[in-house]
Amino acid sequence: MDMGKGRPRLKLPQMPEAHPQKSCAPDIIGSWSLRNREQLRKRKAEAQGRQTSQWLLGEQKKRKYQRTGKGNKRGRKRQGNVEQKAEPWSQTERERVQEVLVSAEEETEHPGNSATEALPLVPSPTKAVPADQCSEAHQESIQCQERAIQNHSQTHLSPTTCQGIAVLQHSPKMCQDMAEPEVFSPNMCQETAVPQTYPPKALEEMAAAEPLSPKMCQETTVSPNHSSKVPQDMAGPEALSPNMCQEPTVPQEHTLKMCHDVARPEVLSPKTHQEMAVPKAFPCVTPGDAAGLEGCAPKALPQSDVAEGCPLDTTPTSVTPEQTTSDPDLGMAVTEGFFSEARECTVSEGVSTKTHQEAVEPEFISHETYKEFTVPIVSSQKTIQESPEPEQYSPETCQPIPGPENYSLETCHEMSGPEDLSIKTCQDREEPKHSLPEGAQKVGGAQGQDADAQDSENAGAFSQDFTEMEEENKADQDPEAPASPQGSQETCPENGIYSSALF
């Protein structure tokens, strides 16, 4: 029974202890949720407070470091980089300023260049490029000034002229050529002296006193295709070289003016008259126009008789072209009507011996023509009266000189042949009338006369007059002249010249 009584007692105290816990549990549940929220709010506030406190402390520390100079090295480096990025613009500007200052200082040394001194000293990136150009232009201006001092005796060129030269990009050689056109090489001088530097009038005035050197004449005749005006300039001072004589005869591309000028007054040496007398190395010479230009008097005729006062050296060259045609005879027949005037013009030609030696070769004068020229024609007293000047050569000089030259009589015959005009040559000149050389045809066209008319009139009159003159002049022949053909060949060619002067 005690057991029963005691059991519920034990149970009872346990029950009421459990109920209050259960009863308190729902009340506490609500409170626990509230507590958690509050705790979260507190924790958040504390965290924010800590963050704010740390931030404030950091800010205060930064301010202290900046004031005292102690701070973050990285921050200093970044600031230095930013400053360096800004500095290159200033450095380029400084360099440009220095360039402008240097150019201004150099220009102050040259007072003529006043325009570039006004450049602004405050530089800008847009104005830097013109400064470089100004420096280059200034260098070329200095070069131009130095050239001008040497060439034009001018101390300073204006900047505009120097810039113009810089724009045109004249090299120093070009400037020298522009400034000194007279300092050429010898070859250039030989080529350009006669046809370019002197006007035709000056050459005509200089023709009497200024014979050109052989090299000069050779260079002037290299280009045969000059216009008519260029040969006038070329032919003024005529100590003609072999090339000069070959050009007007063989190519025959020169006009009448070339041929007229070739016959300008020059003094022939004794050797030249042997080839000049009858073969006429220049078939295109218009004696009428040449005599009008030159105004040569018949007094100069005796000087053309110097054929035999020369050595026999000229005979080989004059005889070499023996394979010939009758064209040179025709060319001679064309201008025989004006033979006297042609003689007057060719008396004083200052042509060297070699010129006509070479000039006779392209004419293709045959061996037969030399033989046909052998019959002597003695001029009458009328012709001698027309040339009143005393002859400088005695009859002895007219005879060929047998000296150390190793030439046979045949060479002498051929030498004296071209000067002695005969009836046979006149007859031969009458026959082939229509095969004139190009030079003679050009001459006839320029004179306004037909070549055929000249052939018919001149050759006919020439043959008739020769037949009459032979009969008259036989009495006037020198007693020393032998009757044989060789003797007639060796006689003085003055007779042929005087007889031709009548025509």
Curated annotation (Swiss-Prot):
Residues 1-129, 381-503 are annotated as: Disordered. It is found in: Nucleus. Residues 7-87 are annotated as: Necessary for nuclear localization. Keywords: Developmental protein, Differentiation, Nucleus, Phosphoprotein. One of its GO terms (biological process) is cell differentiation. One of its GO terms (cellular component) is nucleoplasm. Expressed in hematopoietic precursor cells. Highly expressed in bone marrow, the red pulp of the spleen and round spermatids. Weakly expressed in peripheral blood cells. InterPro entries: Hemogen. The modification Phosphothreonine is found at T286. Residues 385-396 have a biased composition (Low complexity). Residues 1-10, 61-79 have a biased composition (Basic residues). Transmembrane segments: none annotated. Residues 426-436 have a biased composition (Basic and acidic residues). PANTHER family: HEMOGEN. Regulates the proliferation and differentiation of hematopoietic cells. Overexpression block the TPA-induced megakaryocytic differentiation in the K562 cell model. May also prevent cell apoptosis through the activation of the nuclear factor-kappa B (NF-kB). This is Hemogen. It comes from Mus musculus.
